Amino acid sequence: MSQPQLTQEALAREAALPENLWIQCPYCKQGSYRESLGNAQVCPHCHYGFRITAKKRLSLIATATEEWDADLVTADPLDFPGYTEKLAAGQAATGLKDSVWTGQATIGGQSCALGIMDPKFMMGSLGTVTGERLTRLFEKATSANLAVVLFCASGGARMQEGIHSLMQMAKVSAAVKAHSNAGLLFISVLTDPTMGGVTASFAMQGDITLAEPHSLIGFAGRRVIEQTINQKLPQNFQRAETLLQSGFIDAVVQRQDQPSYLGDLLALHTA
């Protein structure tokens, strides 16, 4: 029996369809019409928040902004092969000079210091400029008597900068401590992914720690742990809901609810 032949009209209709009409959620694996994700880029089936740039998140969360330290540029301290090309690619993809946006913003009618790490820039990895901008964020917030809201998204320390990258964990943590000693509020919002040295330092030092649904949060990756202990880990291991159940975080908040939720928290602590 011969196969039916596609008509020229059918072929033309298929060719006219735009690409990437459908997208698969990396968490629930359900396919969705891309437009159904909405402006917030959230899976309509499980509420997983797709990874977005810092500037996109800024447009979702804040109504007024002033960027700080935008002129800081990453160098290549170790002359690491291919690093300058990766930096250029990250800058082109995000419009940032490194993997974090910092500044002053208004969220839910409340003024605060705001930091947003960008997973589209070398997976939000922590380099010298990222660490410096975060340190200055907390220092300026302390001087201005402002609360800090920090959206964390990172694969960890940036290997292309070696020990220079690892030093940022302690440097940012010291600035967080000084901000805390001044009696000021720090809200940490963990997004997908928050891993490695970022989790091991400032991401988990907030007075209030929130997370987006189903975000991957941890230190070492699943495969590394499974190979080390020679056991299969549970399906929801290192997911936001598991951390909430275990008491590591305070709440899981859907992306579209974050402006009002954060605004209420800021209002309570600045009244």
Curated annotation (Swiss-Prot):
Domain CoA carboxyltransferase N-terminal, chain residue ranges per copy: 21-271
EC code(s) of this entry: 2.1.3.15
First and last residues of each zinc finger (C4-type): 25-46
Places the protein is found: Cytoplasm
Cofactor(s) named in the record: Zn(2+)
Pathway noted in the entry: Lipid metabolism; malonyl-CoA biosynthesis; malonyl-CoA from acetyl-CoA: step 1/1
GO process annotations (BP): fatty acid biosynthetic process; malonyl-CoA biosynthetic process
Cofactor note: Binds 1 zinc ion per subunit.
Enzymatic reactions: N(6)-carboxybiotinyl-L-lysyl-[protein] + acetyl-CoA = N(6)-biotinyl-L-lysyl-[protein] + malonyl-CoA
Pfam families (UniProt xref): Carboxyl_trans (PF01039)
Example GO molecular function: carboxyl- or carbamoyltransferase activity
Keyword vocabulary terms for this entry: ATP-binding, Cytoplasm, Fatty acid biosynthesis, Fatty acid metabolism, Lipid biosynthesis, Lipid metabolism, Metal-binding, Nucleotide-binding, Transferase, Zinc, Zinc-finger
PANTHER family given in the database record: ACETYL-COENZYME A CARBOXYLASE CARBOXYL TRANSFERASE SUBUNIT BETA, CHLOROPLASTIC
Purpose of the protein: Component of the acetyl coenzyme A carboxylase (ACC) complex. Biotin carboxylase (BC) catalyzes the carboxylation of biotin on its carrier protein (BCCP) and then the CO(2) group is transferred by the transcarboxylase to acetyl-CoA to form malonyl-CoA.
Xref: NCBIfam families: accD (TIGR00515)
Oligomeric and partner information: Acetyl-CoA carboxylase is a heterohexamer composed of biotin carboxyl carrier protein (AccB), biotin carboxylase (AccC) and two subunits each of ACCase subunit alpha (AccA) and ACCase subunit beta (AccD).
Record protein name field: Acetyl-coenzyme A carboxylase carboxyl transferase subunit beta
Organism: Lacticaseibacillus casei (strain BL23)
